[in-house]
Amino acid sequence: MITKRQLLKLSLGLVAAASGATVMAADTSPIKIGLILPMTGQSASTGRQIEAAVKLWVAQNGDKVAGRKVEIILKDDGAVPDATKRIAQELIVNDKVSVIAGFGITPTALATAPLATQSKTPLVVMAAATSSITEASPYIIRTSFTLPQVTIGIADWAAKNKIKKAVTLVADYGPGFDAEKFFDSQFRLNGGQILDKLRTPLRAPDFAPVLQKVLDAKPDALFVFLPSGQGAAFMKQFAERGLDKSGVRLIATGDVTDDDQLNDMGDVALGVVNSHHYSAAHPSPTNKKFVDAFQAANKFRPNFMAVGG
């Protein structure tokens, strides 16, 4: 498994490649890194987590590489792809950044990919999780995760826990399509049956109509993928519709019950089973050290987006 330190070295190698020359001792100009994140809007939690993680890393490791200061230029795109593309263009042309990082959702990463190829500017995807993103440009690397990575495991778990019939509910965009596709194929491979495939809009979703369809279908379980930030609203409507007492098991990717919002969900989150690549509750000494430092610096706990930053 590639470590975060190895990813850092790879990113710095891309910085050197982007500059077109080996960094010389006499060159003391700053290395500029554009950081495009959703700091406002429904994905603001993602931006807040990644920005906090970046600041923590700099505080712990310093802001110089090979004698050159690293200058991070933070820009808010509100998770709007057109804004992301415009901001990336400005960072490349006006600020002359060596690397652009961030990208809270898949459409923003894909919107910027052609610019990366044209300008030969490396992109470091810290959040967006559609599996095909890294195929959009040879200049893209990812520090986060992919939906197949976390979806196949929960499909296997369902089959081993007497779940025979399921409904899928996903957000209507790239990661949702990945989650739906890979859960469906793995669940059916294990002998399960998909009763219905439901999708909700990425922006301002109303879960009530689709949750009624779930009640009507009477599956053994409901599998859910939603982007980070929508979990609390979904869990609230899940309880309001009585699904928490209907006998339908709720299984999900970890985005739905992410650590940043879990405390706001109340008891309805008890019993939810999810699969993900990170949890702040992981008991390893390395993670405990990270969580303690993150909370001390920010007064809130990290979630899976923070480790991508």
Positions of PLM-derived features:
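Signal peptide-proximal N-terminal region
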Residues: 28, 51-72, 189-192
